[in-house]
């Protein structure tokens, strides 16, 4: 009997010791982020809930060996042949690609959102054209299938309804879901396995489709010799088994593997000015395409494969910035265009900069000014709205809802 209770006490002691050790390691690991949050906090009573939420987020984000636990959990799920993780937050299709999804009974009504785009068009000057560019969803119709029991979110059907409303309002549209399977890119290589974004080669194909669409709207073609839209005139640097995307960071690479990444940039001479501002952070860069429009930090960072700063997709245009202005100094008489966009469009816009004069990019999530007011005050030939099917939600269509003066005023 004595030995029985001794074993119990020893087990309890080891459990408490492990718990205490892990707690101490967690506190050490999260101390600096917690200290920073507390130092910048507004200690008014009305902000108490917000401070608690920030501290909770800091602790959850800086768990000791967090991604070791993620990998272990993902590996267990793979051993059980499971096609979903964390209550269907991330699911696998029959090809092994990861998806964000949720339970839905049908498409979402987006007429209010399409009406906002129509209002944007109505507010633009008579010389400024408006086009909605619908980028494809990772669930590619005619190719992607889910295993039995995996929910479908009706993103494509929602996008169909949204585009129908725009067409009824007389808005020009380009649906990049059309022709995707005829692009010459193998269907399995259109999107990353562990990320919701399309691959860089797919976005380059989309750039060509966009140029072709614009050639039908303007008397002077953007690329009459088909030089800038020819992949042979670009360097393609492959990185094998190099990228873990946003979905893979939730499951671990033992569950889904990792992705190859292609860095594509011009072989020909280029000369750019690149300005961006998000919040209090702003910068200006000048030089060739690869010097001004690309950041190699995500490609070179070591030991932080799961960190957001290592996201290879953000190599282009420094990811999602509130406001961006790209000037192609070699094409001063080209079109001046503006994109209201989400992250999917970023590489495509990077390539489009080779055939236009100026590109402005606004991310509605991070820009604090009035988007319509900015578009009206800026000398523009064309405004594009490019929000992907999964992002057809209120957050990406705040037009006219914010009357704060924009933090960036064009001199053009």
Feature locations, PLM:
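Extracellular glycan-modifying ectodomains
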Residues: 1-412
């Amino acid at each position: 009997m004595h030995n029985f209770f001794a074993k119990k006490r020893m087990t309890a002691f080891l459990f408490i010791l492990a718990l205490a050790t892990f707690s101490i390691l967690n506190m050490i690991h999260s101390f600096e982020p917690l200290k920073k949050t507390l130092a910048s906090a507004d200690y008014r009573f009305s902000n108490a809930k917000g401070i608690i939420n920030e501290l909770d987020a800091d602790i959850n984000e800086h768990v000791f060996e967090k991604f070791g636990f993620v990998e272990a959990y993902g590996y267990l799920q793979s051993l059980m042949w499971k096609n979903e993780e964390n209550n269907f937050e991330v699911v696998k299709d029959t090809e092994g690609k990861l998806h964000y999804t949720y339970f839905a009974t049908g498409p979402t009504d987006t007429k209010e959102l399409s009406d906002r785009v129509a209002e944007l068009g109505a507010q633009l000057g008579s010389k400024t054209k408006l086009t909605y560019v619908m980028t494809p969803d990772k669930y590619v119709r005619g190719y992607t299938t889910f295993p039995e029991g995996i929910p479908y979110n009706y993103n494509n059907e929602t996008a169909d309804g949204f585009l129908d409303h725009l067409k009824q309002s007389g808005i020009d549209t380009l649906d990049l879901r059309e022709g995707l399977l005829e692009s010459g890119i193998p269907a399995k290589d259109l999107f990353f396995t562990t990320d919701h974004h399309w691959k860089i080669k797919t976005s380059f194909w989309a750039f060509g489709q966009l140029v072709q669409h614009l050639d039908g709207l303007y008397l002077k073609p953007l690329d009459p010799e088909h030089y800038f839209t020819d992949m042979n005139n670009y360097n393609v640097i492959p990185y094998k088994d190099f990228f873990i995307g946003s979905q893979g960071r939730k499951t671990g690479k033992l569950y889904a593997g990792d992705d190859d990444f292609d860095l594509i940039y011009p072989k020909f001479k280029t000369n750019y000015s690149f300005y961006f501002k998000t919040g209090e952070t702003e910068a200006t860069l000048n030089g060739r395409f690869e010097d001004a429009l690309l950041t190699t930090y995500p490609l070179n960072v070591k030991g932080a494969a799961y960190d957001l700063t290592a996201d290879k997709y953000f190599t282009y245009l420094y990811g999602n910035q509130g406001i961006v202005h790209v000037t192609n100094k070699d094409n001063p008489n080209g079109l001046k265009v503006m994109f209201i966009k989400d992250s999917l469009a970023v590489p495509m816009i990077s390539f489009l900069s080779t055939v236009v004069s100026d590109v402005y990019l606004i991310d509605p999530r991070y820009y604090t000014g009035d988007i319509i007011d900015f578009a009206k005050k800026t000398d523009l030939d064309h405004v594009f709205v490019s929000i992907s099917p999964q992002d057809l939600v209120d957050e990406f269509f705040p037009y006219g809802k914010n009357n704060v003066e924009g933090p960036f005023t064009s001199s053009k």
